[in-house]
């Protein structure tokens, strides 16, 4: 059995997921090629296959993985597009590669770096990079506050994003030194994080808060863009 065969979901399941992905992406306004859709489904298959080994997600069902991980991550793509077709992004606390792997697939002109402190999760991220042939994806292990541009990472980032990393104020404090001029920090949240916003550090303010609608997901989702004085 080839690597390609091992990572594929059963045909019926894959067809069902493909329809769900196509409908969801269309509803979100995200254009995906056949190759991109295939890569996203291969990624779901990798998550499902290796979850028990790497402890990547509490979700076990591939359909729910597609909804709660893939479509949820795709929902931010139209909003991050304001940074252009060739931006550099850092995904902090990436875990199984979310949303960074999805961004690397959906935005092939972007350079995406995944960051986590857990080595086995970085190992899975590197495996996903290799199996999905994502040349625009990099992996760096370590605490984000210790990373230095020009050393641990090549340069500062236009976009720093997190899906489930920390309190918003802590996220901004720990990652702000890696934001490039003109860049910003984006936090994916569930319910509106008003208390967290109230604790933002000096020199940081909310530029916009977007209520997201994720297809097939009955849950609140918000995307918060934080602007920094030093990055303006």
Curated annotation (Swiss-Prot):
The family this protein is said to belong to: Belongs to the methyltransferase superfamily. RNA methyltransferase RsmG family.
Gene Ontology CC entries for this record: cytosol
Keyword hit for NAD: no
Name of protein: Ribosomal RNA small subunit methyltransferase G
Origin organism lineage: Bacteria, Pseudomonadati, Pseudomonadota, Betaproteobacteria, Burkholderiales
NCBIfam families tied to this protein: rsmG_gidB
Protein purpose: Specifically methylates the N7 position of guanine in position 527 of 16S rRNA.
Disulfide bonds: none
The EC number(s) this enzyme carries: 2.1.1.170
Keywords: Cytoplasm, Methyltransferase, rRNA processing, S-adenosyl-L-methionine, Transferase
Pfam families noted in UniProt: GidB
Molecular function per GO: rRNA (guanine-N7-)-methyltransferase activity
Main location: cytoplasm
Native organism: Burkholderia pseudomallei (strain 668)
Entry's localization field: Cytoplasm
Record field: catalytic activity: guanosine(527) in 16S rRNA + S-adenosyl-L-methionine = N(7)-methylguanosine(527) in 16S rRNA + S-adenosyl-L-homocysteine
Binding site for S-adenosyl-L-methionine: 93, 98, 144-145, 163
InterPro entries in UniProt: rRNA_ssu_MeTfrase_G, SAM-dependent_MTases_sf
EC supergroup of this enzyme: transferase
Residue ranges crossing the lipid bilayer per the database entry: none
Gene that encodes it: rsmG
């Amino acid at each position: 059995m080839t690597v390609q065969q091992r990572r594929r979901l059963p045909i019926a399941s894959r067809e069902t997921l493909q329809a769900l992905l196509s409908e969801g992406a269309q509803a979100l306004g995200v254009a995906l090629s056949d190759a991109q859709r295939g890569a996203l489904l291969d990624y779901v298959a990798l998550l499902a296959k290796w979850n028990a080994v790497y402890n990547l997600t509490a979700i076990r069902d591939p359909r729910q993985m597609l909804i709660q991980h893939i479509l949820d991550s795709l929902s931010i793509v139209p909003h991050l597009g304001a940074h252009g077709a060739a931006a550099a992004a850092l995904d902090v606390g990436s875990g199984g590669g979310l949303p960074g792997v999805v961004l690397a697939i959906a935005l092939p002109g972007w350079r995406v770096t995944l960051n986590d402190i857990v080595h086995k999760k970085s190992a899975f991220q590197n495996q996903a990079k290799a199996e999905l042939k994502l040349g625009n994806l990099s992996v760096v292990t370590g605490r984000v506050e210790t990373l230095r541009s020009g050393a641990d990472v090549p340069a500062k980032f236009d976009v720093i994003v997190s899906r489930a990393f920390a309190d918003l104020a802590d996220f901004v404090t720990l990652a702000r030194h890696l934001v490039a001029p003109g860049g910003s920090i984006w936090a994916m949240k569930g319910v509106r994080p008003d208390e967290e916003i109230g604790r933002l550090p000096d020199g940081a303010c909310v530029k916009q808060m977007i209520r997201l609608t994720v297809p097939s997901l009955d849950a609140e989702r918000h995307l918060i863009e934080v602007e920094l004085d030093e990055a303006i």
